Amino acid sequence: MTFVDNFEFNQNTPRLVRGPFIILNSIIFSLSFILLCSTGIIIYYLNEYYLVKDLTIPLGSFILSAYMVITTIVGGIAIWKKKLGLHLTFMVFLVVLIVCLVGVSAKMIVDSGNPEKLQHKIENIWYKVGNYQHHSKHYHHGIIEIIEKHHRCCGWSKEIEGNYCVHFNRRESGHGYCAPYVEKSVESILKYLGYYGIVLSVIELILLILSGFFLLKTNKNVKSKSFILQD
């Protein structure tokens, strides 16, 4: 017994619908692939400091962007093969993706507006990185030294490190603590990623609407599903 899916997309489906679908799907694929590569590099770098488990946002973004890439590939194949089952699978993937992406993006935006909670997390990470660098080859040219050089700052705060600096060796006049600079940078990154995710969600929602429109344009044979008996 062989199962045959007799649903096929209408060959006369206007290009006005199919064209935007392919364009939007390609845009989402490109943006998600860029995000996948970026978060992969960040995770690789953070893993060197054993920080991946402390920073769930990069890991979550990596998993979500990988899911986006897979979803867009399924969508591309669904359009190419013109099969209803594959297209329905793509739509289910897309709904799950939109829900997850909106949730993660909203959390990033909310976290960026909560400086006290954010400050505590960043401070703990700075402390762990500092301890790790003191006992490893990464003491010089490590992430703390890079931050101090870039912002011309010294240490995290007076309560944490006093007059100690990785790069400047001692506190000099004009070298403030790094906490305000790092916190501001992290807040900006979280806000940027949050709105980036919201924009992607809107594009995916439009793609979902186009996908639904495709289903209305399918042709049905006399029997939507048929079974062929073979000897």
Swiss-Prot record:
Residues 43-58, 105-195 are extracellular. InterPro entries: Tetraspanin/Peripherin (IPR018499). GO terms for cellular component: membrane. It is a multi-pass membrane protein. The keyword Transmembrane helix applies. Its main location: membrane. It holds the Pfam family Tetraspanin. Residues 1-21, 80-83, 217-231 are cytoplasmic. This is Probable tetraspanin tspE. It comes from Dictyostelium discoideum.
